[in-house]
Amino acid sequence: VVSLVGRPNTGKSALFNRLAKKKVAIVFDQPGVTRDRVTRTVSLGDRQVMLVDTGGIAFDKRVTKDPLDDETRSQAALAVEDSTVCVIVVDAREGIAPLDAEVIRRVRESGCSCIIAANKCDTVDDDWRAHEFERFGLKVVAISAEHGRGMEELVSETVSRIPVADKEEEDSKKPLRVAIV
């Protein structure tokens, strides 16, 4: 399982749609559009993975004042708990927000393998904005979910963190075939 997490309006759903190669998640330029987890089995490189889009995580009730935020946080926490890899999506144009730091801290504490996808780096000239996020000590990939920039590197980095199931484990998941002759 690979989950996309982050604060509201960083482009998680746009990235989900880009990786799914289909418009599955609703994308709208307003916080709080995604509330429940959206899942889809997708091909990343040579792997089939369950990709999960989560709602934007907000922790401060004084700021959000939305009763659904607790449920959105809960859904995101479940996604992180179930994940092998968490892609933390940040808005590189806005730089590091306190909420980004809090999301990164909490996801790292989960023990999940983490990558930061610095979104909204629409051109090569924007990539410098992604470097600010390197201070968290995680792999940072400059991307543009809207334009498809950086997807190869993000997919490669993600796939490299997914353990390869051994042959015996794969065989045990296959249905048993029986023939009576």
Question: What spans do the regions from the language model cover?
Answer:
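Conserved G1/Walker A P-loop phosphate-binding module
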Residues: 1-82, 132, 163-181
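Short, conserved beta-strand segments within well-ordered enzyme catalytic domains
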Residues: 16, 26, 50-53, 87-89, ...
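Conserved nucleotide-binding/hydrolysis micro-motifs of P-loop NTPases
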Residues: 32-33, 56-58, 93-95, 120-125, ...
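Noncatalytic linker/hinge segments flanking ATPase motor cores
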Residues: 45-46, 90-95, 156-160
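Conserved C-terminal guanine-recognition region of P-loop GTPase G domains, centered on the G4
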Residues: 71-139
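Canonical P-loop GTPase G-domain recognition
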Residues: 113-115, 120-171, 177
